[in-house]
């Protein structure tokens, strides 16, 4: 009222009457209530002076349209050639494929021995695809622009990663290429002048995996009701104070819970939704035992791990909930009873790994805690990493020693694992990488460098573990998501595979001169490395590792999360399976 009176007193006499007439209306208006919604501005590639992104926007639009037309066979030749003006040549170097492919195997061919040369873009594509018999059965096409350079006043060149995949006569084929596309930028519309590059090929006669979700779980009402709906459905219906979030960072644990010789699985869920246990039955389907087993927690849960804690021959459960760790004893036939709770006051548990690190005959466990708990400055996803490329303000991981009789002690500091322990840790894995008889620990961290803690249990030192990641060559600066050990070269020493996030945009932007112009060379290189993708480290057998990521052709795992060494085709060599992507939504443009 004081403000209204002041404003009225400042008006002229002519305004007095109108002010008085509107006074009643003004006082009757409802008070404005501040809302919680906010409008996030969309990204404009033409703004900000990033000329490279302006070009990328135009090129990417054309390549996406070409991909769609290739998949759907919608006059793609006409469109491909319409992208060109005064096209010069398409040159592709491809591997030579034998006439006979071993049945039930996956084979890779990487030597570009054969040249394909065509005078039109469309002819180059069709000849390439016909050479591998997938022209008429194309299933997937993608173009990822990783770099753009200005070649001359009127020309630009884009470096592009290309994938073609298709099937013919029970043979699945994938082509992966690194190509250079030369464009004319003389006019408003960018036009293609030439395409040159090398391709590798992978051929599989294993057959396709079959999705059995509906046949094995479709008859379970609780499964359909909870998991056939997306994350957006639940976040719009469940109060955030329960612990639900938009991230979807929940894991799956597999074990023979009821001792019948069949694997069962347990799914962690965000707050407000119960964790679910599904028991395999003799007919090949699954039954929901969540409530019956007493592990249908409603607390926010990211990770769970089954292992035999008390050495009685069955699978007990360590569950990571928002407040900390819950220890559940398997009392028989898949029924559980709570035995202990371990609070984690500084950070939220995200993943759990177990091993007998001290060789006393029982399993201990290590907990990765991604980010610190919310304080006065609350965050819905995670705290802002500082610095972004090498953050040290994440959660505090914890090692719990099993002291028998359901007693566990936090020995993180005692055993030396608090060194470099403020990272954004997603996953960890135990392995005796140096073959000295005890378990070492590798930790994959988001926003920076990873840790390899060497276990020197036989040395007379105050602490057992030491971070040797930099000394042995496995720092792996990047957005670490997962880690897997496996002897891929069959030399008797475990090698290391780390899943990170490959980013084509990151490649383009970090390589530009104007990106972090004031930063030193090492910092800029770390940002560039951050976008590279997944990593493969070969164990040299002398305590050190060699980075074989680029030579091994394994960097592009897209937005990778979980990864695992596994001999998928049974040929005696370890393959790598990588889970990637993000939250599925109705808009296909969303990750």
Briefly describe each language-model feature range:
Residues 10-591:
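Acidic, glycine/proline-rich Ca2+-coordinating loop motifs
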């Amino acid at each position: 009222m004081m403000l209204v009176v002041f404003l009225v007193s400042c008006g002229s006499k002519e305004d007095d009457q109108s002010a008085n007439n509107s006074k009643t209306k003004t006082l009757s208006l409802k008070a404005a209530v501040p809302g919680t919604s906010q409008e996030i501005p969309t990204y404009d590639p033409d703004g900000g002076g990033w000329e490279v992104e302006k070009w990328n926007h135009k090129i990417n639009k054309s390549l996406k349209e070409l991909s769609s037309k290739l998949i759907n066979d919608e006059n793609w030749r006409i469109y491909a050639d319409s992208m060109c003006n005064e096209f010069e040549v398409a040159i592709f170097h491809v591997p030579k494929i034998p006439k006979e492919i071993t049945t039930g195997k996956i084979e890779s061919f990487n030597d570009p021995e054969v040249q394909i040369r065509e005078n039109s873009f469309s002819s180059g594509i069709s000849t390439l695809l016909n050479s591998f018999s997938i022209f008429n059965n194309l299933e997937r096409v993608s173009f990822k622009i990783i770099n753009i350079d200005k070649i001359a006043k009127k020309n630009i060149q884009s470096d592009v990663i290309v994938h073609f995949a298709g099937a013919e006569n029970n043979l699945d084929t994938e082509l992966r290429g690194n190509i250079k596309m030369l464009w004319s930028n003389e006019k408003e519309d960018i036009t293609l002048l030439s395409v040159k590059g090398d391709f590798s090929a992978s051929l599989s006669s294993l057959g396709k995996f079959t999705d059995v979700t509906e046949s094995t779980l479709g008859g379970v009402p609780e499964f359909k009701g909870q998991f056939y709906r997306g994350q957006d459905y639940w976040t719009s219906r469940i109060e955030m104070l329960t612990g639900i979030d938009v991230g979807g960072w929940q894991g799956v644990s597999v074990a023979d819970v009821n001792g019948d010789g069949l694997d069962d699985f347990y799914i962690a869920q965000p707050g407000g939704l119960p964790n679910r246990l599904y028991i395999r039955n003799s007919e090949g389907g699954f039954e929901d035992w969540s409530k019956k087993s007493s592990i249908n927690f409603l607390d926010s849960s990211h990770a769970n791990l089954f292992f035999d804690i008390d050495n009685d021959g069955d699978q007990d459960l360590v569950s990571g909930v928002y407040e900390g760790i819950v220890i559940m004893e398997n009392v028989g036939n898949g029924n559980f009873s709570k035995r202990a709770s371990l609070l984690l006051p500084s950070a939220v548990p995200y993943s759990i790994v177990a091993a007998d690190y001290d060789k006393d005959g029982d399993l201990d466990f290590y907990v990765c805690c991604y980010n610190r708990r919310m304080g006065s400055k609350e965050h819905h996803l995670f705290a802002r990493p500082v610095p972004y490329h090498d953050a040290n303000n994440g959660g505090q991981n914890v090692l719990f020693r099993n002291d028998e009789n359901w007693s566990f002690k936090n020995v993180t500091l005692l055993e030396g694992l608090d060194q470099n322990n403020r990272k954004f840790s997603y996953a960890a894995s135990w392995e005796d990488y140096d073959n000295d008889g005890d378990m070492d620990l590798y930790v994959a961290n988001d926003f920076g460098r990873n840790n390899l803690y060497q276990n020197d249990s036989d040395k007379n030192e105050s602490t057992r573990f030491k971070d040797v990641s930099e000394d042995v060559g496995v720092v792996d600066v990047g957005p670490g998501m997962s880690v897997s050990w496996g002897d891929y070269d069959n030399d008797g020493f475990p090698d290391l595979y780390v899943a990170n996030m490959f980013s084509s945009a990151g490649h383009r932007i970090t390589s530009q001169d104007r990106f972090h112009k004031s930063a030193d060379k090492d910092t800029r290189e770390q940002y560039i490395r951050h976008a590279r993708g997944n990593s493969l480290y070969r164990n040299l057998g002398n305590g050190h590792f060699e980075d074989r990521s680029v030579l091994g052709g394994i960097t592009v795992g897209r937005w990778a999360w979980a990864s695992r060494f596994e001999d998928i085709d049974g040929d005696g060599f370890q393959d790598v399976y990588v889970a990637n992507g993000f939250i599925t939504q109705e808009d296909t443009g969303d990750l």
